[in-house]
Amino acid sequence: MKFLLLPVALILAFLLYRKFVLLIALIALVMVWDYFQHTMHLMIHLDILPFVSLFVTSEYGLLIAIPFILISGIVPEFAAGHFEMSDMLSVIPILGVNIAFAGALESQFSPTAYFALLVFVFFQVILFFVTAERTEKKIVEPIAVTLLGFIFIWRIAPLLSFLV
């Protein structure tokens, strides 16, 4: 009987605090993903923060999303000790897009998130040209981030919103 107590308690705790647990899991996912890409010195940096932050803004609101973006966008850059200027500055367009589309994200997530992701990629390409990044980073990375974001918005975001 005592072996059933811990799993039941964990399930009840998850059901009571699932919004908090999901937020912490998303922060951990974004930070570990970013840290891994920096420590492996990958040439193409597929950032999942733009569309995860759009989901957090739609589900938790802008007051939770702003610290989420700042923590999960900047901390892995310093933790890895290897950061590029464009990756460091990409937090600014992410914040701008989330602030600009915060009201619409809460009412209609999917169409607004698709458009907001395209706006973010446009400003990220401008940022890549301003910071004089490599050619493959200017061309391949925005396309890959857009496709990955569309897949996230289309398939994974509905599953996550079911948990919240």
Mark where each language-model region is.
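Membrane-embedded alpha-helical hairpins and interfacial helices in multi-pass inner-membrane proteins
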Residues: 1-5, 23, 81-164
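Residue-level recognition of pore/gate-forming positions within transmembrane alpha-helices
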Residues: 30-31, 73, 121
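Membrane-helix boundary elements
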Residues: 54-55, 59, 64-79, 83, ...
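Short, surface-exposed helix-loop/turn micro-motifs enriched in polar/charged residues
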Residues: 20, 43-44, 67, 85, ...
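Hydrophobic transmembrane alpha-helices
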Residues: 1-59, 155-156
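Mid-membrane cores of alpha-helical transmembrane segments in multi-pass membrane proteins
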Residues: 26, 46-51, 65-72, 91-96
